[in-house]
Amino acid sequence: MKNLEIKRHYNLDYKNTNLLKKFVSVDGKILPKYITVLKPKNQRKLSKAIKLSRIAGLLKFLNN
């Protein structure tokens, strides 16, 4: 899997599901830092945005 990154012009928001789907595995798990190559602050923001999106019903909890 290739390394992913968040560009500066992207808005890391829980409603931006197209961006968040890039950081979720096929199983529905949040990708770890060594794959996303994000700084710790951005990794935390990403995981919070994914969790909020799941609670809001925009992303699935698990992909079966």
Curated annotation (Swiss-Prot):
Q: Which GO terms describe its cellular component?
A: chloroplast; mitochondrial small ribosomal subunit
Q: Which InterPro entries match?
A: Ribosomal_bS18, Ribosomal_bS18_sf
The protein's superkingdom reads Eukaryota
Is RNA-binding among this UniProt entry's keywords? yes
Compartments in which it is found = Plastid, Chloroplast
Major subcellular site = plastid
- Classification via Pfam families: Ribosomal_S18
Q: Which parts form a coiled-coil structure per UniProt?
A: none
Under Gene Ontology molecular function, one entry of this record is: small ribosomal subunit rRNA binding
Keyword annotations of the record: Chloroplast, Plastid, Ribonucleoprotein, Ribosomal protein, RNA-binding, rRNA-binding
A single GO BP: translation
Record's subunit section: Part of the 30S ribosomal subunit.
Would you identify the family this protein belongs to, as annotated? Belongs to the bacterial ribosomal protein bS18 family.
Full protein name: Small ribosomal subunit protein bS18c
